[in-house]
Amino acid sequence: LWRLGDRRSADERLADIEATRNIPDVQDAAILYRELFQDPRATSLSDSRPESLNGSVFNQRLYEPWRSEEAPELARFIEKHRYIIDKLLEASALDECRFPLTTDITAVLSEVDYASMRQWAFLLGFAANNDVAEGRLGDATARWRCLLQMGHHLRQRPVLLDFIVADGIQTIGLKRLIRFVVAEESTETNLKRIEAMPLPTADAWTENLRDIRMADDLPVQKMMEQWSPTERLKYRFYAYRFNKATGGLLNKSTSEDKAAQSYFRTMALARGLRIIIALKRHRTEIGHWPESMDEIAALLPEPILMDPLNEGPFVYRRTIGAFELYSTGANKIDEQGRGESEGSDDWPIWIPPAPAPPSRNGQDPIMNELKAIYGERYITRPRADANAP
């Protein structure tokens, strides 16, 4: 038997699952995404993206406000593809999304164009930052909400890669929202809009993983139904030997562990955003950031204060005129907020950006004099920090 006590074929099991997922087309955001999947222009954004978006400029435009005159090529690129943004906003107005499941092992990953959805996420991020710089905060928050809703839509199909891509898309929106709340002019109206967004703060990983495994079994079962009992035994034997020889290359649990880490890191950002909104309200009312999270704990549901990566508290630390907020990661060791890029396990929620380097245009006489005395490498002019009280 494929499953003890379950004699249904893969197609019968799939039909039962899809019956529980069925919704009217007018409620299904997947219909709108599919229209974009079938548009060659919408699925080739990376080919037409401005060449100026190289290296650090890409992240700068994705996470910081910019004006059209600063990046005219990018502004024209956004305007040319505004119809994609409009279609994504239309999809984001729907809560339900039903990308189909399948028993065809060759088609599992072809129902969703992951690469295009990632490119659309970048497009939304670029456009939102242009909106912020030019005073269109309502448009910016709509685009950030759209990023979160895209992730919410993807997670409604129990496929591991859908969850991983969802995390990546939502992370763009969450990181940008955190910066907006902390370091920019976020009003109470903006904070309420953000709180109303589909923030992924609830832990449903156990239920999600159960559904993912069930859907994951279907294509394999369908394939093995066409084999003789001997061929099925051979498949299991060779799969076991290959997995052992390659150190778990095909080990499903390894992929699940990575997906779980991504899921909980995204959740940590979402919970961190809720905490930061409470911190910002305290700063607006009192005039400075709290000395500890005890001052705002009563304003938040208890689960929001829990770090999902280790089920302990987040680290909140006041600095000079600012603060740091981060997870100590699965190892529960406080490594001062340093993340994977620095060889550590911490997961930063908000670490104030480093001061800008000194001007090199030679127009600052005081800085030039200091350089002459001490040498340029020792001179740093601190940048005004909007995170300060």
Q: Where is each model-derived feature located?
A:
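Short acidic linear motifs
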Residues: L1-P389
